[in-house]
From Swiss-Prot:
This is Endosialin. PROSITE patterns: C_TYPE_LECTIN_2 (PS50041), EGF_2 (PS01186), EGF_CA (PS01187). One of its GO terms (cellular component) is extracellular exosome. One of its GO terms (biological process) is fibroblast proliferation. Interacts with PDGFRA; this interaction promotes PDGF receptor signaling pathway. Interacts with integrin beta-1/ITGB1. Interacts with insulin receptor/INSR; this interaction diminishes INSR autophosphorylation. O-glycosylated with sialylated oligosaccharides. May be N-glycosylated. GO terms for molecular function: calcium ion binding; carbohydrate binding; extracellular matrix binding; extracellular matrix protein binding. Keywords: Calcium, Disulfide bond, EGF-like domain, Glycoprotein, Lectin, Membrane, Phosphoprotein, Signal, Transmembrane, Transmembrane helix. Residues 162-232 form the Sushi domain. It is a single-pass type I membrane protein. It comes from Homo sapiens.
Length: 757
């Protein structure tokens, strides 16, 4: 160690007594840092403090690029000169296997990608602190030595935010620009000036300009003033030094401008395209905070994670973009039409193609024409009401009036006629009334036969038609009159047209009396089988009426049994009943009985005594003639209840007219027979179930027994003792070769050993 110190002292000996290094400080700057050489004798600690005072640190050339910049700055100096760099090692910190051999940068780390040691590492104890100096000549190798010795100079490194380029020489300029760096280094040979540097320009006219390297509003750093800087020159010589446009200011200065799509560069003279280096994928336009803005073509949109990139827009997700079918592809979409249609000129709409389209258009026109004819039929049907207003009894849910006398020669005397107080419920609202769709409509409330809506009514022979019983009743006021379309039977003679019997009620206000329309019985078609009122309820009750010959002083009564609906829904005007074909018995019977499909208890069966029955009708029905007719006659009893008619789309409850019966009849009725038949059918079903269930249980038990038998009672191998097993194993290998082998597939000779523990 002492020998090395002596060698170092001997190397520095010739310089003792001589002038220090007479070279001026100089620097080399790049876009991000500067290296400055100060030829002043300092120890390592003094050099480090000098760099810190200027805002830098001792040089730390970590990469080959930084080392090359230091080499260009030092150049070919004297061979004996040394310069301190920022590399030191503490005592007893030798790490020869590392690139820096245990040395540490003055910044506190050991990261490096470049080393240039002058001597190989020596395995010593490292008892003292060591520092590294750079040779000023040759290959600028690194030498380690004592940190307390003074060397010829030191290298400082300065970092900064940005740099301004050196100014270009102008035509009216008196000399090169002089630059002053923040670390107080003055020179005219800089290529880059760190942030905060000052440039002084001297012009021939005697006036100069001073510029400062500052931050620009759009980002980065630049000179505070753009050229040209010297007055009196104007734009005549060489366009004022401007690349695109030169503008002479009022004060004699000139400024440069760029055409549209370009921006002025940092030198103040040249122009650059901001989109030339922009990372836009499709389209770029100058402007914006970065000097450019990215845009996408039609059919694309900017990506959410990267606005410079464009992604496809799925136009088919937009509602109504195509009339029928839409297919999306990258950059656009296309509309398609289904089979039988073709795309129109707009590329969106579809129209029927060829003859099919013409036929479709013709069908559409015919449909519209039919709708117009239907509307005309409605108008004609309503015009028929002008001369057809007559006095009719109120709707079933209205107050009762005097009972009709049916235009008969006799007038039956009912004890209840003196106090006609029938408790009909008040309607919550009047049912809506609409015009009939066709002249012949099946919306009838009070008729002598049930209204058949779901099927066409067959034409009946004249011999099977019931007599006509005209309805008469007290006259009503003009406000209470209800329009009626008279019953019309084109297939029947007038002598055999059915009579229309209506319920007599008290007068109601006009707002609660919708018109009563009688039914005409032509052959109905399915299209004309809808009720006249848009909100109607049809009682689907199958009613069978036995009509005997009516003796004198007997009133024909028909009772329809069924469930009574609540009075809150009286908004129906149509009865759809399906009558069964039963012969009408002309002989006198004590009562008239009506049966329905649902079984009804005998308490609900109503009979009419003979004493209260009116005289026979003028024309009796022929005996033993099957018909599809019933005779619903409106009740006049003060305690009878009006039938409640449900909606057509709901359930079909039974229609009921309640009449008091003085004496219940004991004769068996068709209702009881129907109930017994249904009970018998139900008993047959239960008998079938009672037979099937035990049979299934018996089969399951047999199956279980078979499984148990197969698993527990099958053949098993006999149990053997463990000694037998050993004997079998031992003698198995000593069989004589002449012993015959059992045939393949046979269990003969196969011994199994099963032991019990």
């Amino acid at each position: 160690m002492l020998l090395r110190l002596l060698l170092a002292w001997a190397a520095a000996g010739p310089t003792l007594g001589q002038d220090p290094w007479a070279a001026e400080p100089r620097a080399a700057c790049g876009p991000s840092s500067c290296y400055a050489l100060f030829p002043r004798r300092r120890t390592f600690l003094e050099a480090w403090r000098a760099c810190r005072e200027l805002g830098g640190d001792l040089a730390t050339p970590r990469t080959p690029e930084e080392a090359q910049r230091v080499d260009s700055l030092v150049g070919a100096g004297p061979a004996s000169r040394l310069l301190w760099i920022g590399l030191q090692r503490q005592a007893r910190q030798c790490q020869l296997q590392r690139p820096l051999r245990g040395f540490t940068w003055t910044t506190g780390d050991q990261d490096t990608a470049f080393t240039n040691w002058a001597q190989p590492a020596s395995g010593g104890p490292c008892p003292a602190q060591r520092c590294v100096a750079l040779e000023a000549s040759g290959e600028h190798r690194w030498l380690e030595g004592s940190c307390t010795l003074a060397v010829d100079g030191y290298l400082c490194q300065f970092g900064f935010e940005g740099a301004c380029p050196a100014l270009q020489d102008e035509a009216g300029q008196a000399g090169p620009a002089v630059y002053t760096t923040p670390f107080h280094l003055v020179s005219t040979e800089f290529e880059w000036l760190p942030f905060g540097s000052v440039a002084a320009v001297q012009c021939q006219a005697g006036r100069g300009a001073s510029l400062l390297c500052v931050k620009q509003p759009e980002g980065g750093v630049g000179w505070s003033r753009a050229g040209p800087l010297c007055l009196g020159t104007g734009c005549s010589p060489d366009n004022g030094g401007c690349e695109h446009e030169c503008v002479e200011e009022v004060d004699g200065h000139v400024s440069c401008r760029c055409t549209e799509g370009f921006r002025l560069a940092a030198d103040g003279r040249s122009c650059e395209d901001p989109c030339a280096q922009a990372p836009c994928e499709q389209q770029c336009e100058p402007g914006g905070p970065q000097g450019y803005s990215c845009h996408c073509r039609l059919g694309f949109r900017p990506a959410e994670d990267d606005p410079h990139r464009c992604v496809d827009t799925d136009e088919c997700q937009i509602a109504g973009v195509c009339q029928q079918m839409c297919v999306n592809y990258v950059g656009g979409f296309e509309c398609y039409c289904s089979e039988g249609h073709e795309l129109e000129a707009d590329g969106i709409s579809c129209s029927p193609a060829g003859a099919m389209g013409a036929q479709a258009s013709q069908d559409l026109g015919d449909e519209l024409l039919d709708d117009g004819e239907d509307e005309e039929d409605e108008d004609e049907a309503w015009k028929a009401f002008n001369g057809g207003w007559t006095e009719m009894p109120g709707i079933l849910w209205m107050e009762p009036t005097q009972p009709p006398d049916f235009a008969l020669a006799y007038r039956p005397s009912f004890p209840e006629d003196r106090e006609p107080q029938i408790p009909y419920p008040e309607p919550t609202w009047p049912p809506p009334l609409s015009a009939p769709r066709v002249p012949y409509h099946s919306s009838v409330l009070s008729v002598t036969r049930p209204v058949v809506v779901s099927a066409t009514h067959p034409t009946l022979p004249s011999a099977h038609q019931p007599p006509v019983i005209p309805a008469t009743h007290p006259a009503l006021s003009r406000d209470h009159q209800i329009p009626v379309i008279a019953a019309n039977y084109p297939d029947l003679p007038s002598a055999y047209q059915p009579g229309i019997l209506s319920v007599s009620h008290s007068a109601q206000p006009p707002a609660h009396q919708p018109p009563m329309i009688s039914t005409k019985y032509p052959e109905l078609f399915p299209a004309h089988q809808s009720p006249m009122f848009p909100d109607t309820r049809v009682a689907g009750t199958q009613t069978t009426t036995h009509l005997p010959g009516i003796p004198p002083n007997h009133a024909p009564l028909v009772t329809t049994l069924g469930a009574q609906l609540p009075p809150q829904a009286p908004d129906a005007l149509v009865l759809r009943t399906q009558a069964t074909q039963l012969p009408i018995i002309p002989t006198a019977q004590p009562s008239l009985t009506t049966t329905s499909r649902s079984p009804v208890s005998p308490a609900h069966q109503i009979s009419v005594p003979a004493a209260t029955q009116p005289a026979a009708l003028p024309t009796l029905l022929p005996s033993q003639s099957p018909t599809n007719q019933t005779s619903p006659i409106s009740p006049t009893h003060p305690h009878s209840k009006a039938p409640q008619i449900p909606r057509e789309d709901g359930p079909s409850p039974k229609l009921a007219l309640w009449l008091p019966s003085p004496a219940p009849t004991a004769a068996p009725t068709a209702l009881g027979e129907a109930g017994l038949a249904e009970h018998s059918q139900r008993d047959d079903r239960w008998l079938l179930v009672a037979l099937l269930v035990p049979t299934c249980v018996f089969l399951v038990v047999l199956l279980a027994l078979g499984i148990v038998y197969c698993t527990r009672c099958g053949p098993h191998a006999p149990n053997k003792r463990i000694t037998d097993c050993y004997r079998w194993v031992i003698h198995a290998g000593s069989k004589s070769p002449t012993e015959p082998m059992p045939p393949r597939g046979s269990l003969t000779g196969v011994q199994t050993c099963r032991t019990s523990v």
